[in-house]
């Protein structure tokens, strides 16, 4: 117990961070604006205005904001006259946006310094490749194809706003900054939108997405802290892909010790911990869903389920219902993760063996991790975006009157290429042809509606130039490398390509499966 205590302490310099004065520095908000201009070049899927950066930010507006922040009467909350003394962000929407962006940049400073130290200690090269969403799927192909049980885990959300603030207090012991954050969040009445993206208002999900992601990632680290601790205790047995995202939190050791008493109910922690060791256990998470796969028994997975539920409820006051953790056999269950439907597929390898005058036919089943595109949810997303109806029939999309034909073609073509680029890892490309057909015909109907013409006449006038806009990047690359005969074969539809430049999930594939 004494050995693990030292490994769970954080650097003392992190505990002495004084971040509050940075809220009144102009260069912080200038840095936020510059970051918004630069981030557009690295993210090819979302426009800059959807990432929460305002082009209208200026030095004058920042100076006025800082001046109002120095005036204490703007931040006083009066019980007798609450309507007149409300926080200034209710009067000025741009102030709320600038403060939320400044919050994120300032609070990210300690975590950024710790992340740099981790990368230097572990000597991780090409860290940008690990950021890719597609980097998870090769890991799944290599690691979990031989595992038996899979647990789909929906990470619980905090029942009160104060839990989020206390989470940051464990990592950033700067009381003025956290009090400012607490007051700032309480003034925004829709605080549930921080945790549940479904109920998030359009204002917070678009204009303040960076602050939402920071708070949510801090919350998720709370839920994953048990895996970080087990990784420390038995690193040669337990493998955690999420380890290293954040450092250990202050007082975490005391909570783990309390957990041993409440949940395990044994004094000898090392013997109790040995019960949970599994050399073939792997953990993967993206957004609010995680996967815990193991080669052990169903009884072991049930123990893990109970262990996680008590861990979240007793130590962090996170309510976790039993149906949020589902245990399934991997061979009979498909994983819905990041817009893909992944499953195990049995490929049979027939081998002919000859021994003297006798022949033997050996049928060898081989498990293969397979990922396909769930076409029905994807069509549902297209219908929600007004590209088609619920049955998949293409419809014309409302456009601005001043939009040119080239702008419309470029927009539809970019959406088609992005979807094809994201789903390049699917083993069944034919399912994407229906999506391309919907987008192509929806574009034709939109242009025909604009010119008050029929679709047939419009397609006849455009000819092959219209089809070139929907030629995907993968088809262009493969056409230069492979022969036309190979591209026309059935095998070309099964080729999977994982890209390491995809760091954001497309909104059209960011759906959730429903039972």
UniProtKB/Swiss-Prot annotation:
Pfam families: Intron_maturas2, MatK_N. InterPro entries: Domain_X, Maturase_MatK, Maturase_MatK_N. GO terms for biological process: mRNA processing; RNA splicing; tRNA processing. GO terms for molecular function: RNA binding. Disulfide bonds: none annotated. Keywords: Chloroplast, mRNA processing, Plastid, RNA-binding, tRNA processing. It is found in: Plastid, Chloroplast. One of its GO terms (cellular component) is chloroplast. Usually encoded in the trnK tRNA gene intron. Probably assists in splicing its own and other chloroplast group II introns. PANTHER family: MATURASE K (PTHR34811:SF1). Belongs to the intron maturase 2 family. MatK subfamily. This is Maturase K. It comes from Ceratophyllum demersum (Rigid hornwort).
